[in-house]
Amino acid sequence: MTATQNHKMMEKIICFLQKTDMFTMVNIYTNGHHYSSDNYPEKEDTIVCKTKYGEYYDMGECDVEKIVEYANKDTITMTFEGPLYYDYNGYSEHSHHSYDKLNQIAEPYGLYAEQGYAWSLAFYK
């Protein structure tokens, strides 16, 4: 995947999570950067980004392979707690809705989501 494709897919994921109130305690790693649903005020160089549904934060450069054991630096890797964790792992009333939707978002790019830990996933060809 190109950097542009990774970024477009990431923004589609963020929009879906924002629309469904699951964009809390979510971290996304792509193109050598760390993006987050949460702002850390002590981090002065954070860049505020926006979608039509809300804000997300570019936390700067990051080597995802130093953060998550099961990562794919060539696409998108995610870590999460909160609402996405509960839905993705089958603990909510709409269990696995996020699993299905994330795979629908990934499919046009020839990718699928694979869970590493209960709190992480990465996209693969």
Which residues are covered by each model-predicted region?
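Short, extreme N-terminal segment that most often corresponds to the first beta-strand
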Residues: 1-21, 25-28, 114-125
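Acidic, low-complexity, intrinsically disordered interaction modules
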Residues: 35-116
